[in-house]
């Protein structure tokens, strides 16, 4: 009975916990997954994007962002922002309409759904009778005109969504008002286009799919003009002055129609097939925009020659003799053009083209010669190459920050200098208190550096490791280059490139030292690169060293992929991070753990075969250690051929079933232990009903060495601690494996004045075997004050107190199943905490975080942030290992999201909710990136962006986020993750990137290795 009862709560501690811990999902970084609709408000200067999962996202100035999620999770097919209002209407693929509003609450705007409506037909009518194809918000903001597949146009009153049946424009009524010769030439079919007259709100244009276009007088209920085309109509555009119509058609042509009072049925002024004369694909949308200079812009989507370029996704711009077909690597969803916002203006004067593709957003500067792209301050295509790992570094020194930005600015010379043109709303969030970096490794061998200081994720710099290796492609190849006489005049735009030249280039581990500027990256084929930040371009040879992890083993044969061939001579590297040494592991298996100690100039690396230590100052190998067990034969087969035998799979399955039956016999059969005990306590002692029950700890069973790859190196950790005796501390390297083994090596690092003359020596000092053989996921040493040891060079830069070396040190080992504290140097067990409460729970990520109090500026505590395979996040105290709070963060079915999670040094975190989006969350009350912004409908912006130094960075972007404290449930409907993760395709797409072979399934995504992260860089 006693073991189920937890001692009474300490009210002081509970109050302090409320000051330290609070769970929030704050913002989603990146590009919306599977976009399906685009909208724009010229008056508010707000862009809207809808997705197939039912989410809508609004973007304005950097830091201004809103998100909403339809309850039905149906695809958004159209978005229309009401003119001059903070309202928008969405159409879903289930034929429902939804009205959303931006309302001010507490001094900030929030996006809320006000009404929903489904158009109903008369009893017995076919579904096509009311299937909406086009939505036209009237300029009065009081009416919606709805074109349907039946050819009828229905009218709905806003904001109540009340159908006005007496105002319906039926196809029969239109037919009766047409001249006799036009009545029999066309079958109406569906409505393809609805447009309001730019100057007269009493006239609307109705375009039918078979080619008939009519101008309808709303007051007189009559046809003013009608136009007949011989081709199927796709879309239509009404010139700003109302004197010209431009229609586009299914054969790749467009026609210009004059609006003349002399003829009720005008003939086309001009009909043109821009990419003819051969058969072309349909032009699905066209804009004809006037300018003060007199020459219009013609911008259209599609129309490419069907035979040769039918697979291209293009949006074309024609102006003043210049024609360019912007070629995208993913399907174009829609586009819009930013023009003069005042509807009474005489000219459109377009200045920017905004194209929404399936995998990215591209903005083109139409004011600058050559029409260069504009750099995005948000909506970055994180998955331009698939993300394979992530690494977060907090509190970057200003000097390093400026050097990274300077290196990145040289890569952005091809971008326009135009200020970001979508600048509606006002961000109310203060500037971030520090500079943070999020580094993402990619399948194509690149590492991207993102400004993660606020909620507006911005690309600073891109590093490519491809130049080091011999590949089939030329790294200097310019994909956007084309000949002057080439036709069609294609130009590649955008950054999305889903194809990798060689999967072995993929980055698996990243470790950045923010004080020295050293960077270590490791890849899929056993390559470990050490790089140094250089402000100037350099041509240099990369020194190559081979690390044979099987040198003492016989009878093993690697069956996986080959190593990457590297350049033997000098290679030119641009300013930025430049590699100077390549350590090639043999066999060339995936690097599973990485650690860098820039003060000692050492880098440690681990694979499924063992680990090694390399001195990157003297360019020599210190030692290698093979960790293979005789049963680890599969570790030599490689990720492409690693398949477990059916016999072994069945044997292990039956073994688990037997264990489950045995353990179930030992428990009471009436349900979970906590529930059973709670019922018995209430029955026996009513007075104890309000006492809290301690969770039942699951029994930890010893694992067989055949259960997993026991030699798989999960984590590496450097520490200056007491390893041999309590009188003298020394540098050390710790390694934890998948079989529950911890290796400790004492290191002799020469002093700085003799560093190049004497060699680093290593000697194995200890080997610890955990009884339950669970994989070791984290190692940490605590000083005499039970505080984690500081980062390398952190004390030298006066950013941390010197560790307490005279006191007794403690070793914390975190396995998948328990936390255990040992005393040093004797390594005797002192404390332990088993992972509790739920059967099958395993530690997946663990990191040390500093939690500051929101009330007392000078008070803070170090704790462990722990993510389990069930998606729960727990905070565990140091050094007493007492659970503090637990939150439900990621769905347990989202294996890929759990695998991609990284923690920060101050209690925040990131994980992938789709291949292109990170969800950001916070566990801290103090370090909370809280986005707030304001959009005012009365504030109509008519200014045009000028050319400056590029987009100005704002500190944050806004999303309404729900707060979840311990024990509370998440607010429904606001998190896009719920919609995305209900789609199995999304989960499989992330999982295919982040989960490789069986041996690296749980560890290929690099966790945050900053500050006191356990295993500093390893898994």
Swiss-Prot record:
Keywords: Cell cycle, Cell division, Cytoplasm, Exocytosis, Phosphoprotein, Repeat, WD repeat
UniProt GO cellular component terms: cortical actin cytoskeleton; plasma membrane
Localization: Cytoplasm
Sample GO molecular function, one term: myosin II binding
UniProt cross-references to PROSITE patterns, sorted A to Z: WD_REPEATS_1, WD_REPEATS_2
Start-end of Basic residues biased regions: 647-669
Ranges for region Disordered: 647-688, 939-975, 992-1019
Top-level taxonomic group: Eukaryota
PTM-bearing positions, type Phosphoserine: 653, 965
Protein modification: Phosphorylated at Ser-653 by PRKCI. Phosphorylation is enhanced during cell polarization induced by calcium. Phosphorylation may occur during the cell-cell contact-induced cell polarization and may contribute to the segregation of LLGL2 from the PRKCI/aPKC and PARD6B/Par-6 complex.
SUPFAM superfamilies: WD40 repeat-like
Coiled coil: none
Keyword match Cell cycle: yes
Gene Ontology annotations of biological process type: cell division; cortical actin cytoskeleton organization; establishment of spindle orientation; exocytosis; Golgi to plasma membrane transport; regulation of establishment or maintenance of cell polarity; regulation of Notch signaling pathway
WD repeat locations: 36-69, 76-117, 132-169, 193-227, 233-268, 282-324, 332-366, 388-464, 508-583, 592-653, 713-769, 778-830, 835-888, 902-925
InterPro entries to which the protein is assigned, alphabetical: Lethal2_giant (IPR000664), LLGL2 (IPR013577), WD40/YVTN_repeat-like_dom_sf (IPR015943), WD40_repeat_dom_sf (IPR036322), WD40_rpt (IPR001680)
A Pfam family recorded for this sequence: LLGL
Keyword Thylakoid: no
Family per similarity comment: Belongs to the WD repeat L(2)GL family.
Functional description taken from the UniProt entry: Part of a complex with GPSM2/LGN, PRKCI/aPKC and PARD6B/Par-6, which may ensure the correct organization and orientation of bipolar spindles for normal cell division. This complex plays roles in the initial phase of the establishment of epithelial cell polarity.
Subunit structure: Interacts with GPSM2/LGN, PRKCI/aPKC and PARD6B/Par-6. The complex is enhanced during mitosis. Interacts with DCAF1.
Name of the protein described by the UniProt record: LLGL scribble cell polarity complex component 2
Species lineage: Eukaryota, Metazoa, Chordata, Craniata, Vertebrata
Gene field: LLGL2
